[in-house]
Amino acid sequence: MTTQELNVDSAEIAKFERLAARWWDLEGEFKPLHDLNPLRANYIDERAQVAEKKLLDVGCGGGILCEAMAQRGAIVTGIDMGDAPLEVAKLHSLESGVNVDYIKTTAEEFAAKHPQSYDVVTCLEMLEHVPDPAQTIAACAQLVKPGGDIFFSTINRNPKAYLFAVVGAEYVLKMLPKGTHDYNKFIRPSELAQWMRNAGLELQEMCGMTYNPITKHYKLNAKDVSVNYIMHARKI
């Protein structure tokens, strides 16, 4: 199979492969993810109570969310298609003393082998990096048990999002390497909600995650989904 058939963008994979060694550098290229992670992890745990539940993180990268979920008592599996990020994730889990099972596979391949196997599925800051996000969402829906919780987060597609997430984050504040994001791959909440409905998921909540460049902190803001946002859905 080609990477396109696997719903994988080889250029996106290569981008994160190059940066993998700095995944856990709190002041490096992934600092925004580290800053955002406590907010994401708390949001998920408050709504899904992850302790002792089987949780799958799709597009886990270097394992930032996986470790946070494992520390909260979840039984965590992380999947990704990048060799270098997965190696970094495995090594860091040994250093951290957390137990996470990391596997190189796509969501679609994994769903075919493990349908309805997880209580919670997370797919954060990943949908804007695949050729067909609707296909990934359908795979996530297949992986979660009936009544289980799914969380997606991504970036809205509008002029403000372009200004903040591309121009501001990559060129002005230099929080991210140039070229990290492709504006055309950003996803409007209405599009994500429709793809979730098509996959048999019921939207529970949508919330924005806003960044203050002065305090350098993120916070939840249910009234502002204009840039970063997270959606909580449940398998019907």
Curated annotation (Swiss-Prot):
**Taxonomy, superkingdom:** Bacteria
Keyword presence, Manganese: no
Q: What biological-process terms (Gene Ontology) are attached? A: methylation
For this protein, the record's SUPFAM superfamilies field holds: S-adenosyl-L-methionine-dependent methyltransferases (SSF53335)
**For this protein, what is the EC number?**
2.1.1.222, 2.1.1.64
NCBIfam families in the cross-refs = UbiG
Query: What is the designated name of this protein?
Result: Ubiquinone biosynthesis O-methyltransferase
Q: Which organism is it from?
A: Saccharophagus degradans (strain 2-40 / ATCC 43961 / DSM 17024)
Q: What is the lineage of its organism?
A: Bacteria, Pseudomonadati, Pseudomonadota, Gammaproteobacteria, Cellvibrionales
What gene does the UniProt entry assign to this protein?
A: ubiG
